[in-house]
Amino acid sequence: MLAVFLQGFALSAAMILPLGPQNVFVMNQGIRRQYHLMVASLCALSDIVLICGGIFGGSALLSRSPLLLALVTWGGVAFLLWYGWGAFRTAFSRQLALATAEELKQSRWRLVVTMLAVTWLNPHVYLDTFVVLGSLGGQLTPDVRSWFALGAVSASVVWFFALALLASWLAPWLKTQMAQRIINTLVGVVMWGIALQLAWQGASL
């Protein structure tokens, strides 16, 4: 059981650790200390749903529906281009100001919607959870499949909370205008790079 748990944990961690839309968003909110634990919780919860869905049968749905995959892919491209543009606009604005407490209060639901879009409109999430984890987990016998799923979701929960807390701890050094310009530029580059990669993949669907 422990070996299967560790296998799920290691495989999930290997797919979560690379810099992607989810990680960038959680890190950014941690630096701003702007509902970062809520964002980490929602990211982890979304991953739990996706991972369990993939391992316990959802991988077959995605493999049988090229249209669904295409819709998710192009929706993701559009969203990532929009999000990246916002990051570039912030990075190169003449006056870069941190949000006030009142602005943070008003933007909570916008953050929730953006986080859900970052997760659920990212085709890589479905490929990781449904195709990779789903295919491997589906090959296991029912008595150990749950341990594989538990290991996979544990990696997700640990990672997102660790990233949010670490970014929050480093916030005093990363909240300067220069650091924010650099971070937002990197966010824009990552988002547009992933969008172009997805567009290339979507053209071949």
UniProtKB/Swiss-Prot annotation:
The transmembrane residues are 1-21, 37-57, 68-88, 112-132, 147-167, 182-202
Q: Which UniProt keywords apply?
A: Amino-acid transport, Cell inner membrane, Cell membrane, Membrane, Transmembrane, Transmembrane helix, Transport
Its UniProt entry gives the catalysed reaction(s) as:
L-arginine(in) = L-arginine(out)
Q: What is its main location?
A: membrane
- Membrane topology of this protein: Multi-pass membrane protein
Localization per record: Cell inner membrane
Q: Name one GO cellular component term.
A: plasma membrane
**What Pfam families does the database record attribute to this sequence?**
LysE (PF01810)
Query: GO molecular function: any one?
Result: L-arginine transmembrane transporter activity
Protein family membership: Belongs to the LysE/ArgO transporter (TC 2.A.75) family.
How is this protein named in the record? Arginine exporter protein ArgO
